[in-house]
Amino acid sequence: MRDAVTSLIRNYDTTGRYFDRDAIESLKDYFASGNDRITVAAMINSQSAEIVKAAANSLFEAVPELLLAGGNAYTTRRFSACLRDMDYYLRYGTYALIAGDMDVLNERVLQGLRETYNSLGVPIAPTVRGIQFLKDAIKEMAAAAGIANTAFIDEPFDHMTRELSEVDL
C-alpha cells in the first residue's frame, strides 16, 4: 500500500527529477487536508454501522426490487452479504482517504471484483449506487462537522465506482 507522498516520490525518482511546481502543490494540498482526513476517518470509525445502515436504507429505497423475492438482497443471507460488502467498501475507502492514494483499493478491492460479481450474478449497478450512498453519508457528516472542502472524500469512492462501472468495448 502506498500513500500520496510515496507515490509522488516514486514517480519523480523513476524519472530522475526534482519536485516541480505541480509536485509541490500536490504535497501542499495533501498535507493541508491532513487534519480533515483524520477527522473524517475518526468519524467513520465511530459511526461505521450507522453509515452502512444509512447507505443501505438509501439503496433499498432507490432500488426496492433488491429486497423482493428473486432480488439480490432477498433472504437474510444475501441481505447480510450486501451489508458486509458495503462495510468492506467503507473500510477500504477510509484507508484510501487517509493515504490519499488509490493503490490499496486497486490491490485489495477492485482487482477481479467485477468479474467475481458477474460470475456470481451480483449486479454491478446497485453496488455502484451503494458506494455512492456511502460517500454521500460521509460527506453529510463531514459538512455537519464543519469541514468545508470534502473533495478528498470523493476520491476513493468515485474511484471504486468508476472502476466497477468500466465496460470493456
Swiss-Prot record:
Cell location: Cellular thylakoid membrane
Main location: membrane
Sites bearing N4-methylasparagine, chain numbering: 72
InterPro entries: Allophycocyanin_b, Globin-like_sf, Phycobilisome_asu/bsu, Phycobilisome_asu/bsu_sf
Membrane topology recorded in Swiss-Prot or TrEMBL: Peripheral membrane protein
Keyword Ion transport annotated: no
Any single biological process term in GO: photosynthesis
DNA-binding recorded as keyword: no
Record: residues binding (2R,3E)-phycocyanobilin: 82
GO cellular component: phycobilisome; plasma membrane-derived thylakoid membrane
Assembly, per entry: Heterodimer of ApcE and this beta chain.
Role summary: A variant beta-allophycocyanin (AP) which forms a complex with ApcE, a phycobilisome terminal emitter that influences energy transfer to photosystem II.
Protein name: Allophycocyanin subunit beta-18
Annotated organism of origin: Picosynechococcus sp. (strain ATCC 27264 / PCC 7002 / PR-6)
